[in-house]
Amino acid sequence: MIKLRNYALMCMLAGPFFVHGQNTQIKGFANVDYSYSKTGSSFSLGEQDLFITSSINDRISFLGETIFKYSATSSTLFAASVERMIVNYNVYGNHNLIAGRIHTPVNYWNDSYHHGRVFFPTIDRPLMFDSIIPLHSTGVGIQGKDLGSLKFGYNLFVANGLGSNEVLDNDKYKSFTASAYFKPTRNMRIGASWYNDLISKGATAHGMKFDRRVRRNLASFSIANFGKKLELLAEATAGFDDVDSIGTKTTVASYVYAGYRIKDKVIPYVRYDDIQYHGESHGTMKNSSKMVVGVRYQINYLAVLKLEYQDVRTEGSADVNKIIAQIAVGF
């Protein structure tokens, strides 16, 4: 009888948590890599991604993404980083008001893939994401998706600019992102975007400190088609930096990815990245390219093996060649 009473009490206490938490989902993603080059070989832990979604009511929802990764400056050698924290309010139909920290919707890759490597078509992001692409933005905006027969979508977002952090803007200027896309077929998406920001003198972005004020504009275009057999993804971004006392300098970053499913679970692929810098606003940044040849083995939709050969060429530096293997999972 005592055990029965204790069990009943536990159910009564736990009941409210089950009721209120029934629309919350917690998922995880992780990857482990192995790399080999002429300088040596290493095993490495990738990012462990904690992915939370929750429907608070019929209009309000939440998305949170926190990663845990190696950090040389941490006493435990690991650090947590909040990559996305989004509160979504459904205004009408497929139109939403969003607030928080998002992946800046400048192109298909940044808008479609989160930090779970299991969904990446290749092991790493293209080179452009290490340079001029603003990966994250913290602010407020509106978005729409799957509108009409062409599945039209749009994003308008105002945020703290480059050089800011997640709790404080470093100047009075705000960045603005406008993007739109449509889907002429079920597997194809074509889109374009415009990003504008004023970077203050002394700000640091993409690992570079700006010694002059820069008005940055980014124009991006993308086309993606992931069919049953053929996978194609091509994106390009033209950057225009209006630099105090210098004038306008340009940067062009692009990549092309192609994969072909030769068997149900086997997809060989190639990717070519290219970045061309022009002008003093980019400091020590050098023109670079990257060739990737690989194969992806899809164990299932939550477990993937990838093997790649990478050749990276940077102006004024020796070529870097390596072989990388990765296992990525979701759970």
Question: Across the structure, where does each feature detected by a protein language model lie?
Answer:
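Alpha-helical transmembrane segments and their juxtamembrane interfaces
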Residues: 13-15, 68, 111, 245
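Surface loops at the rim/top face of extracytoplasmic beta-rich domains
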Residues: 163-178, 201
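Bacterial Sec-dependent N-terminal signal peptides
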Residues: 1-24
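Outer membrane beta-barrel
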Residues: 23-35, 39-161, 172-174, 181-190, ...
